[in-house]
Amino acid sequence: MSETRVRYEKKDHVAYVTMDRPAVLNAMDRRMHEELAGIWDDVEADDDVRAVVLTGAGDRAFSVGQDLKERARLNESGVAPTTFGSGGQAGHPRLTDRFTLSKPVVARVRGYALGGGFELVLACDIVIAAEDAVFALPEVRLGLIAGAGGVFRLPRQLPQKVAMGYLLTGRRMDAATALRHGLVNEVVPAAELDQCVADWTDSLVRAAPLSVRAIKEAALRSVDLPLEEAFTTSYHWEERRRRSADAIEGVRAFAEKRDPIWTGQ
């Protein structure tokens, strides 16, 4: 039996998801997508998990995206090329179109985040990049399309002209430029990357877990709604939060001048 493609660990309320094919710069084949889908299912179901760190093994790449050698073999065998989203493909729904994942995902990026790797980054909630990180959607140079969300998310996260420049040319973006455009939260030297990620996950874990889930859901679901409609829309995790013991505990702890004890209930 071949080795697993993804390492999955949990510690202190944080799930660590590592794409583990460093010899091919963590290129994603169908088996990796299948493993990741099972992991995302577990992350959502496990109430002890309050945050996720997604990264790639080694120091050369977060992920260079689709395994193009596998794609070439599939093309030769008559398997239809992919288009938008992961419907009908291995590992559906993938993170890029798993719109109900309520836990915050932190991308830890070293080296290349290209194609589907960059699309994963765009789907994360917080992005911490090393100074050597490089981002690009090179599909246009390969007769492909950034169908795992790149063509949709990049124009939502950048000014339109800036996004179109990268989408239509496949040009690369360095970490400093990504920070300037607001695509990443912090850029740090590689030696400081793990500590910076830990600082962010510590903050997430200290926060009320139901509040985190409610805020993520409401913020992402409402982003394209008219403001009046956003206020009147019902949000599942906000209904859970406002009826929770944690909603009482947080205020009580503040009044009693102590740290809150979150139960997620």
UniProtKB/Swiss-Prot annotation:
Q: In which pathway does it act?
A: Antibiotic biosynthesis; vancomycin biosynthesis
Q: What's its catalytic activity? A: a (3S)-3-hydroxyacyl-CoA = a (2E)-enoyl-CoA + H2O; a 4-saturated-(3S)-3-hydroxyacyl-CoA = a (3E)-enoyl-CoA + H2O
Q: Which domain of life is it from?
A: Bacteria
> What protein name applies here?
Enoyl-CoA-hydratase
**Matching InterPro entries, A to Z?**
ClpP/crotonase-like_dom_sf, EnCoAhydt_DpgD, Enoyl-CoA_hyd/isom_CS, Enoyl-CoA_hydra/iso, Enoyl-CoA_hydra_C
Key words of the record: Antibiotic biosynthesis, Lyase
The record's annotation in Gene3D superfamilies points to:
2-enoyl-CoA Hydratase, Chain A, domain 1 (3.90.226.10), Lyase 2-enoyl-coa Hydratase, Chain A, domain 2 (1.10.12.10)
Q: Summarize the protein's role.
A: Involved in the biosynthesis of the nonproteinogenic amino acid monomer (S)-3,5-dihydroxyphenylglycine (Dpg) responsible of the production of vancomycin and teicoplanin antibiotics. Catalyzes the syn-addition of a water molecule across the double bond of a trans-2-enoyl-CoA thioester, resulting in the formation of a beta-hydroxyacyl-CoA thioester. Physiologically, DpgD could act as a dehydratase, facilitating the aromatization of the DPA-S-DgpA or DPA-S-CoA intermediate. It can use the non physiological substrates crotonyl-CoA and beta-methylcrotonyl-CoA.
Give an example GO molecular function: enoyl-CoA hydratase activity
One Pfam entry name = ECH_1
EC code: 4.2.1.17
Q: Family, per the entry?
A: Belongs to the enoyl-CoA hydratase/isomerase family.
GO terms of biological process kind: fatty acid beta-oxidation; vancomycin biosynthetic process
Organism for this UniProt entry: Amycolatopsis orientalis (Nocardia orientalis)
